[in-house]
From Swiss-Prot:
Name of this chain's protein: Cell shape-determining protein Mbl
Main location class: cytoplasm
Cross-referenced PANTHER family: CELL SHAPE-DETERMINING PROTEIN MBL (PTHR42749:SF4), CELL SHAPE-DETERMINING PROTEIN MREB (PTHR42749)
Places the protein is found: Cytoplasm
Subunit structure: Forms polymers.
Disulphide bridges, residue numbers: none
Function description: Forms membrane-associated dynamic filaments that are essential for cell shape determination. Acts by regulating cell wall synthesis and cell elongation, and thus cell shape. A feedback loop between cell geometry and Mbl localization may maintain elongated cell shape by targeting cell wall growth to regions of negative cell wall curvature.
GO biological process assignments: cell morphogenesis; regulation of cell shape
Gene Ontology cellular-component terms listed: cytoplasm
Organism, as annotated: Bacillus cereus (strain ATCC 10987 / NRS 248)
This protein's encoding gene: mbl
Length: 333
């Protein structure tokens, strides 16, 4: 049995793993539960996520990646090791080649941390590739042609925006404004307006079920429960789409500005291609209601959501591993 090539989308919110010949075989939250007293890892992924906010004092649920980069090296390594062992892709004789994605503007120290975590969890050769490039490939864009393609990849910790041509990034921007910040903004809005404390999972729920960033695009209501800050007792309130648009207005504007900045730095010939082809949205944040309409209105170009936007990066790693020998050597650090 030979080891298989594996592609990893190491996200702030989720880890997805693509195995050559099998497709996406793992999609779990990037969460690790540890015992605070002993430092022992108790659970990883889905099991650990279900413990968030519901554990006794000695058990903490940690998200080892923050804003697209490793915040806790040892725990990231433990998490990767757990996921790779779960797949059983290592054979007795050989270790797998791993392609792992990172945001466009991370430092060489942060790159080294990602590479080492992957090597220690059992990779033979570890390739690093920039996330928006891999997302574009996974979304089916022809990035190796001499024409302009623009991708906006909205993850949990970062939004990566890039214009690509001839298989490389022409202009790009990576900002720490993405899904997690939207959740926090909703949580703070409810706290300010209703004096009600809610958890991260509730605010994500609100975002998905009633949230929109395009004014008037949605009118739904949701009943939520939390703890009253005045009485300390549980209380139920109803929130509507309009309030969430208000709460997320400034955050959405940050993404719009970053996308405008990338377009402004794009050579005119490539800009013309983007007007024809449109901008492709990938990542979990592409599913945020109204983000496509908002970007289309502000950028004055067509905006399309990729098919299965959450899977684009993982699928892209698979395609890149198939063609690893044809890729520019400079890209594979």
């Amino acid at each position: 049995m030979f080891a298989r090539d594996i592609g990893i989308d190491l996200g702030t919110a989720n880890v997805l793993i693509h195995v050559k010949g099998k497709g996406i075989v793992l999609n779990e939250p990037s969460v690790v539960a540890i015992d605070r007293n002993t430092g022992k890892v108790l659970a990883v992924g889905e099991e650990a996520r279900s413990m968030v906010g519901r554990t006794p004092g000695n058990i903490v649920a940690i998200r080892p990646l923050k804003d697209g980069v490793i915040a806790d090296f040892e725990i990231t390594e433990a998490m990767l090791k757990y996921f790779i062992n779960k797949l059983d892709v290592k054979s007795f004789f050989s270790k797998p080649r791993i392609l792992i994605c990172c945001p466009t503007n991370i430092t060489s120290v942060e790159q080294k941390a990602i590479r080492e975590a992957a090597e220690r969890s059992g990779g033979k050769t570890v390739f690093l590739e920039e996330e928006p490039k891999v997302a574009a490939v996974g979304a089916g864009m022809e990035i190796f042609q001499p024409s302009g393609n623009m991708v906006v990849d909205i993850g949990g910790g970062t939004t990566d925006i890039a214009v690509l041509s001839m298989g490389d990034i022409v202009t790009s921007s990576s900002i720490k404004m993405a899904g997690d910040k939207f959740d926090m903004e909703i949580l703070n809005y409810i706290k300010r307006k209703y004096k009600l404390l809610i958890g991260e999972r509730t605010s994500e729920d609100i975002k998905i079920k009633v949230g929109t960033v395009f004014p008037g695009a949605r009118s739904e209501e949701l009943e939520i429960r939390g703890r009253d800050m005045v009485t300390g007792l549980p209380r139920t309130i109803t929130v509507c789409s309009e309030e969430i648009t208000e709460a997320l207005k400034e955050n959405a504007a940050v993404i719009v500005q970053a996308a405008k900045g990338v377009l402004e730095r794009t050579p005119p010939e490539l800009s013309a291609d983007i007007i024809d082809r449109g901008v492709i949205l990938t990542g979990g944040g592409a599913l945020l209601h109204g983000i496509d309409m908002l970007l289309a209105e502000e950028l004055k170009v067509p905006v399309l959501i990729a098919e299965n936007p959450m899977h684009c990066v993982a699928v892209g790693t698979g395609i890149m591993l198939e063609n690893i020998d044809r890729l520019p050597k400079r890209a594979l650090r």
